[in-house]
Amino acid sequence: MNARALLCSSNIHSLYTSNRPPEKTSSSRSLRNLKPSPKSLRVWIYPRNRSSVFRVLVRSSDKSESSNSYYVEGDKVSGNNDVVSDSPSSIVLPWWEEFPKRWVIVLLCFSAFLLCNMDRVNMSIAILPMSAEYGWNPATVGLIQSSFFWGYLLTQIAGGIWADTVGGKRVLGFGVIWWSIATILTPVAAKLGLPYLLVVRAFMGVGEGVAMPAMNNILSKWVPVQERSRSLALVYSGMYLGSVTGLAFSPFLIHQFGWPSVFYSFGSLGTVWLTLWLTKAESSPLEDPTLLPEERKLIADNCASKEPVKSIPWRLILSKPPVWALISCHFCHNWGTFILLTWMPTYYHQVLKFNLMESGLLSVFPWMTMAISANAGGWIADTLVSRGFSVTNVRKIMQTIGFLGPAFFLTQLKHIDSPTMAVLCMACSQGTDAFSQSGLYSNHQDIAPRYSGVLLGLSNTAGVLAGVLGTAATGHILQHGSWDDVFTISVGLYLVGTVIWNLFSTGEKIID
């Protein structure tokens, strides 16, 4: 039953407005001869999948209304009596039925990104005992760490096209289950030999590569513009909390059960998420039969038109300077971010002389700071937009913080000898970096909402190239140079990105 509500009344004329066929029996004709009843009876039935709200309203002669409402789930019925208004909207649904569906989608995307980084950073910790067991040198470690990005690079644009044409639900679901299987297979591949491990890590990148374009496609359809920064900040904070969770639990699991346990336990969580995703999510509000009319109207009034994409206007997209600003700044941003993501535990272990457990636990703080800062930045950005600041200025302010903050704090690492201050500097660097979620990471939906998946695929391809080159280059730099050289390159790219972003970016829609 697709109708949201069914209205029945003892007034025969109202039957013709309730989607019921006219009654032609003799019993119905006899109803017209009945004297008006002093009480009017109305019934609303609200079907919600396997549950319903059933309410009977009775109006007395003094025009007050009493009611008895029932919540039905399976064979269980519960009810209550009260006095209500003359509107179906006064029906009180259980809290889990009233929770905005768009935020259910956001939370599911958040949890997917939580798993994404849990499965990605576990290698950053496990690589330490694995290197000792298999005798890998820093160059080999850099090769293993960068192999993830080989597959990740392949599916950025393809994932965006796929999401924009067939819907983000299928694409994100595919990505999560694919990378979860690859995670589980990692210990087996490592035992078989280095080539097998490189292939499995690349396969894992294939799955994670479609996640960001698919998520961007889904949220561009579900989230109103005034909630865009907050929703994206929450989803991306899932990545940071995934790093926190992975870095915190990996040392414990390795210590108790050995390094393979990290991959088996983290990878198995993907099946739990997939079950919830398939039952609760839809690619678009138009495909969701359980969406309440009020929320459907809110989304329709405040989201860009999302007609099905049949072809991608590549020439138009690539002719726009703000698109190239987005692509180049994504490269500048991700160089430093991915180096810290993959090499931070090694930095703590080699430079700051922390043991395995300490390296994992202390690596948590920068990512925890990012999770907090990303959500704070999202709230600040949406507040500024609601108070009349242009989207362009808000995006430039937030991304400038996201570039200059990390540049400043990474520069300070050269002058710090205290391990405590080094960890604090790293946390501040990552915390200011998180303001980028309300800058360049929100900009795809600003400038090309219909093609946001493809556009994110384009810019993130540049970001992944930065990850591949930066992660592999760091291994070679450390064989012949120092960590100061690694950080200097990152700072230089942050400064270049700041200039490009403030000269060429915009928050206005430039592609319909």
Swiss-Prot record:
- Keyword Chloroplast found: yes
Q: Can you cite a GO biological process for this protein?
A: sodium ion transport
Tissue and organ expression note: Expressed in flower buds, sepals of mature flowers and mature leaves, less in senescent leaves and at low levels in roots.
Give the UniProt subcellular location, in the record's own words.
Plastid, Chloroplast thylakoid membrane
Q: How does it sit in the membrane?
A: Multi-pass membrane protein
Q: What induces it?
A: Expressed with a circadian rhythm showing a peak during the middle of the day (under long day conditions).
Question: Which GO cellular component terms are attached?
Answer: chloroplast thylakoid membrane; thylakoid
InterPro entries registered for this protein in UniProt: MFS, MFS_dom, MFS_Na/Anion_cotransporter, MFS_trans_sf, SLC17A9-like
What organism is recorded for this protein?
Arabidopsis thaliana (Mouse-ear cress)
Q: Which UniProt keywords apply?
A: Chloroplast, Ion transport, Membrane, Plastid, Sodium, Sodium transport, Symport, Thylakoid, Transit peptide, Transmembrane, Transmembrane helix, Transport
State the family it belongs to: Belongs to the major facilitator superfamily. Sodium/anion cotransporter (TC 2.A.1.14) family.
Q: What does this protein do?
A: Specific for inorganic phosphate transport across the thylakoid membrane in a sodium dependent manner. Binds glutamate but cannot transport it. May act as an ascorbate transporter at the thylakoid membrane.
- Alphabetized GO MF terms: phosphate transmembrane transporter activity; symporter activity
> Could you identify this protein by its name?
Sodium-dependent phosphate transport protein 1, chloroplastic
**Pfam families membership:** MFS_1
Family matches, as SUPFAM superfamilies: MFS general substrate transporter
Query: In what way does activity depend on pH?
Result: Optimum pH is 7.5.
